[in-house]
Amino acid sequence: MAREFYGYFDSIDADVREYDAAQFAHILKAAVQNGVSSHEGGLEVTADGLGLTTRVAYGGCVIEGHVYVLEDDGGGPLTLAHEPSGTADRIDRVVVRLENDQSARIMGVRLLTGTPSASPQPPALTRNAQVWEVSLAQVRVRASATAVAAGDVTDERGDPSACGYATPRWLDRAVAAQIRDSLTVTEAGYALDARQGKVLDGKIAQLSAEAARSAR
């Protein structure tokens, strides 16, 4: 049987309305997809080449209906320290993590340290009912390096599989409909093959990301 949920309304004496965090997250998750928002600097990760550090710009994101905001408290941007990588390159990941179990109930920027290797891979993202991570950037820590260069940072915010943008869920459908409407169908029953379908999916993701960036 279908179940309706709605909110939010003030209580009155004869009709008390109470809501908890899970109900608020339920509504927000239905409206907004996971990812960074256009708030402030969008949680962009950068490096200045002056040490084994990266910086995270002010901004915000939405993860599974929960909201995270990094703002200026007067002490400067958030700085992360990366460990030296020794004799082989390593790829770290800067993520925003939601910890939703009852003992934690917290969100924050976290540094995932990779494993040095001749062919290094970024740490896997944890995504389950209790912990959900979105990746802001990959950071390559080069062997024996004493600094992270600007070019060692790979922005992952625009990759929907890693992070994405906190745009309305209807936006992807609207973009897809726009693309379908713009296609000129010359044969009845025209169908996309696997390659064309993959290209179309990529274009939809690209346009969604561009729409989110233009809203900043």
Predicted stretch roles:
Residues 45-47:
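Extended, low-complexity, intrinsically disordered tandem-repeat tracts enriched
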Residues 3-12, 16-19, 55-179, 195-199, ...:
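Beta-strand-rich solenoidal segments
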Residues 186-196:
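Short interaction-hotspot residues at assembly and binding interfaces
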Residues 1-43:
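N-terminal alpha-helical "arm" segments
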